[in-house]
């Protein structure tokens, strides 16, 4: 089958990465369709809907490239699958990662299903990751060539079935080259700045946004031995290892969040970047997903490396099944400020094996007060 007989539906955001993705596929001769996903009603404080601006950029890019385009609304799916999860996690005192859930439930589920209904053979996005297709048909996901932009951390929940239908055309090139291609082609998005932060918050103040949905409950900020250091403005506004926004003055080392007590509405703080309470030996994680589950013996356990947050260096770990629903991930050396609700993502070299959601964090067999 020649490329012209292969239909690829590209998820287009109005940014430079997805614009170049569509251009590259068109140049390679594929039958390309651009689709803009509207996942959130994101009118800003001035009454301007940024999604409209982004869609206008998609229209212009698609016209420049010479491909058809559509818009599809996934606001209900996004609310049900991503935003509800986001709020529930904050209610539990955890720090969620909505990008991971958005990829799992929207971009590579709702959008993938929609694309297949349009007769697509594959979907493509502007993610910095790579797909390796083996002769027997199974696939592996590899880190993007641009280490600084690699996005496999956020794609850790994707299954073999999902990835077999996915292309990441810019995963083999660096961001600077993506910009160069966009400028060379005269694409209107060539100099558009990258979006940052959580898509549904955008440029809004995080505290203000969250308080619209969850009532803040101020409480005491104390040390682990009970010394009161001040007031917090609501546990949901703080994450493990956080330094800024505590409002604790005085001399000596800066103060950091080392735990939360939901029952008593207490925020635990301690002084010093390397305070002992910030370090742990192992974690328990649930909702785990592996691209090739049969390659990993969870009963015997296996060694690999892991990331506990985006752009963090890999850490050597040992992964083993804890029970039917959870994994135990033991670190080769203590790790600082691991955060419940975030993803732990596993690697063998450049291959992303999969990931899980961090539930509890332990030191010397004792559970830390990260979220209790």
From Swiss-Prot:
Q: Which residues form the active site?
A: 102 (nucleophile), 199 (cysteine persulfide intermediate)
Q: Which InterPro entries match?
A: MnmA-like, MnmA-like_C, MnmA-like_central, MnmA-like_central_sf, Rossmann-like_a/b/a_fold
The segments labelled Interaction with tRNA in the record are: 149-151, 309-310
Any one Gene Ontology cellular component term annotated for this protein: cytoplasm
Task: Report the enzyme's class at the first EC level.
Answer: transferase
Per the UniProt entry, the Enzyme Commission number(s) are 2.8.1.13
Q: Which NCBIfam families match?
A: PRK00143.1 (NF001138), trmU (TIGR00420)
Q: Show the segment(s) annotated as Interaction with target base in tRNA.
A: 97-99
Any idea what this protein is called? tRNA-specific 2-thiouridylase MnmA
Disulfide bonds, paired cysteine numbers: 102-199
Q: What does this protein do?
A: Catalyzes the 2-thiolation of uridine at the wobble position (U34) of tRNA, leading to the formation of s(2)U34.
Give the site residues for Interaction with tRNA: 127, 342
Reaction(s) catalysed by this chain, per the record, are: S-sulfanyl-L-cysteinyl-[protein] + uridine(34) in tRNA + AH2 + ATP = 2-thiouridine(34) in tRNA + L-cysteinyl-[protein] + A + AMP + diphosphate + H(+)
